[in-house]
Amino acid sequence: MRLNGARAICQSLVEEGVSTIFGLPGGAIMPLYDVLPEFPALHHILVRHEQCAGHMADGYARAAAAIRKPQDQRTVGVCFGTSGPGATNLVTGICNAHMDSVPLVAITANVPNNMIGTDAFQEADITGITIQIGRAHV
């Protein structure tokens, strides 16, 4: 099994104690979905719209915080979205979590690097869009 970006993301999620992910497969993020079966510790919940993924990850982290013991690790909500409209559909959930300091990780795809800034199909500056409502952008 060759380590690639998708496997590195999934392995990192497992190592950080993530067990549940909310998302909707789509074009640019398919490499991540292709390797998910290799990580049985990650339970993916399929949503009908990316906005649901953002809100469900937010709610999941809030609910986990309400029932966790003080010594337990803080549970983070994780959601996936594909490039362009898939990523922008996550924004309301990200903002909602940010407003209440709920730990949420949103992983989105993008167009290939050489196509950024060319108005490529499903290109959106998700970093620029979320700069005010996020702590870190990679």
What are these regions (language model features)?
Residues 1-137:
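N-terminal alpha/beta PP-like core and its mobile active-site loop of ThDP/TPP-dependent enzymes
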